[in-house]
């Protein structure tokens, strides 16, 4: 059973996925996870304005209630977090999670320690990436359940603490899915292409805005088959699996950004599809 907020500051119980309507990710209240928070307002009332860490949050009408879908950044510390809902606070708990480590060997040393010219390129690309991830449209981002973007084994999990050639680097901000060079990559849901290009680390990359701060990212493609401004539906081809950028072999790196926080893509897939060694 769910409970509504009482008073100006209230704790809200986060809903188990099975209690919710379809077209929602699974809740996992950890760094890199997702909080699904009932806002205590029926859908017969105006949609609440919700912010978290000074960012606009997705608000969905599910089962006649307004629900916030909140991406929790990977660097969030365990403890109490707060949503600003109109002029009130609603608090929720984030639990601790220890992610495993992964050691990779990269033959191209510049992909581990870029030179000055590389860093200039990386800095410029970061501006483009951040702009794409900050995209916002008012569409319902989950009109239907997501489908896997490529048919393959999940080979590297989200959140891994990574070491390249023995040197620590940023955590793994997506899911790696094995594939053969040239395998098709499809959009998991409806959306608009907001950015494409060849990036230093990510190689050939596509960004899809699904609505309300939900943006997906597809890296290391051998070929890009879409252009910015193009609309896509679930199952439409975005490009082909490749090995461009910083890779050890052909695969798809798939990232999901929610309110500009990288979250576990597996939470948007059926549990049987969310497996990795």
PLM ranges: what are they?
Residues 21-98:
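Cationic-aromatic interfacial patches
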Residues 8-9, 19, 159:
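Cleavable N-terminal signal peptides
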